[in-house]
């Protein structure tokens, strides 16, 4: 989007700003962990953890909004949060173990949202820069996984899969861009509640 919209100047301005550059790098690290952990869950048959993470995330996003941004909720909203927390706790109790990976996935996205809100950089520019900063590491990980093989091998080096990998980036860019644009003017608590619209 940045090259297409001619926003190189804005991107360069953000990259030159030490504080904003740190925010963008941190955002890139947290979203990379979030997606990497989600993919690991799916690839290793831990689908419950992957699904549970997206029920935990809204609660954590609301708490981050309350603690970091001093957002206030009404009594009815706190009651809704408590009901959601009870709904999330039920499968944890039934499973008999603490879903650490699910909590980390949910927490990483809540922190990602807080970073994007604090940075207050236009959505297209921030998504472009965070992707740019973590791309070398991501490409290195893909290469290592391919060379080693195993259950989390992506199978993308060579053939038509090599074409699909960049296209997957295009498809996943749009939701991140929209989220990045929206979180600048939306409270963390409202964004957390809206996360329950997500398919899990």
What are these regions (language model features)?
Residues 52-56, 123-133, 173-200:
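Helix-helix packing/entry segments at the starts of transmembrane helices
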Residues 76-92, 103-107:
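Hydrophobic transmembrane alpha-helices of multi-pass small-molecule transport proteins
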Residues 1, 40-59, 96-108, 158-170:
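Structural signature of hydrophobic alpha-helical transmembrane segments
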Residues 1-16, 84-97, 135-160:
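Membrane-interface helix-cap regions at the ends of transmembrane helices
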Residues 8-37, 100-104, 152-174, 195:
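Loop-to-transmembrane-helix transition segments
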Residues 1-3, 97-150:
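Transmembrane alpha-helical segments that form core, pore/gating elements
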Residues 25, 41-42, 67-69, 119, ...:
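Hydrophobic/aromatic residues within transmembrane alpha-helices
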């Amino acid at each position: 989007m940045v090259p297409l919209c001619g926003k190189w100047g804005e991107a360069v301005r953000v990259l030159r700003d030490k504080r904003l550059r740190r925010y963008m790098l941190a955002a890139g690290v947290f979203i990379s962990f979030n997606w990497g952990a989600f993919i690991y869950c799916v690839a290793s048959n831990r689908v419950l953890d992957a699904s549970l993470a997206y029920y935990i995330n809204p609660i954590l996003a609301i708490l981050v909004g309350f603690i970091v941004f001093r957002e206030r909720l009404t009594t009815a909203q706190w009651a809704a949060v408590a009901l959601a927390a009870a709904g999330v706790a039920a499968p944890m109790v039934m499973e008999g173990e603490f879903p650490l990976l699910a909590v980390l996935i949910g927490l990483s996205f809540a922190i990602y949202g807080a970073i994007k809100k604090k940075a207050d950089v236009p959505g297209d520019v921030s998504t472009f820069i965070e992707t740019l900063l973590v791309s070398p590491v991501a490409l290195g990980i893909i290469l290592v996984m391919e060379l080693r093989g195993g259950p989390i091998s992506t199978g993308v080096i060579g053939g038509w899969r090599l074409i699909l990998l960049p296209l997957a980036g295009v498809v996943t860019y749009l939701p991140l861009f929209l989220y990045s644009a929206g979180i600048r003017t939306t409270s963390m608590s409202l964004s957390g509640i809206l996360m329950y619209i997500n398919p899990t």
